[in-house]
Structures are given as C-alpha cells and as structure tokens.
Amino acid sequence: STAAQTEVVKEKIYSYNELTLIFSEIKGKYVLTAAASVGENDTFSRGLKVGDSVDKIYDGYYRDADYMNHTYYSDDKTAVMGKMLYGSFTMDALENVKTKDKVEYGVINYKGASSVETSETYILEFTYFEPPYQSGIAAVTDDFAQIAFDIDDKGIITAIRWYYYPEEESAE
C-alpha cells in the first residue's frame, strides 16, 4: 500500500460580523489567503459589495463583447457548465494547453443548471495565474488567485469570496 502524502497547512481564521479572513502560513509567515463576506458593509475589488447588482460586476470587470456565445463545457464535453466571459479555457484544461503565458479567465458558472435563467443561483468567477511557473508551464499546483461572486435569481450579489492559492511544493 502507498502512503498518501498530505501537507499540513497552518491557518488562522478570523470572523467578524459577516466577514471571514483566513491567513495561511507560507514560508514561516502568515499571509492572507482568503476573504469571504455575506454582508453589505465589506468592500471588495472594484468597489463591489454584497447587495450590488450583477451589472456592477459586468461594468467593473472585462468581458468579451460576444461572451454570451462562448459556452464552456465539462472536461468530457457532455455538460454545459456556463459561459466564458473572457479567456479560452479554464484551469481544468491546463494539463492539455501547456502554456507559459499568463492565464486569465472569467466564467459564469451555472452550478448545474442549463442557463442563468433556469438557475436559482449562479456564480461569476475570475481566475488569474502568472509566471514564473514551477515547471515552466502553468499548472494547478502553481499559485493563483480567484474571486467569486454568488448571484441570486434577481441578479443581486449575495456573497463574495476571494482566494489566493499558494504554490504547492513539488513532490520530488
């Protein structure tokens, strides 16, 4: 039997009112790796807050002019996952794409529904990777940042989550 290698991550979690901050130990120092809010008093990037309209996200973040024509699918291409706001692939495709460049994309995640209109809630997600990469090409084990906005059926932001995923140590 092979022993599974697990990495112990030391975290400090602070919650105040409707805001949660997570600090993770990276190279001996605690670094902010997540912030999440369900409250209207917490401001995130581009001035966005819970309670704002989804239109404010569209106004604040880049999207391709024809984004509603860019469906994104599951890896096996059998299920519609949502729409690509910009970018041509998600992190699920990094293994096949093998890029040395920045990876930036935004998606509308239908959370299992077939469209925004049929979904009770959906998520707008923005993800960013930047070189240098451990192996020279972008991989899910490299560090990256992501911000996600939960949207209700009225087009209102109900939660905001920001994450920084630190580079995973190479298993050599």
State the predicted function of each range:
Residues 1-27, 55-172:
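A cross-family detector of function-defining hotspots
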Residues 34-40:
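Well-structured core secondary-structure elements of compact alpha/beta domains
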Residues 40-48:
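Second-shell loop/turn segments in exported
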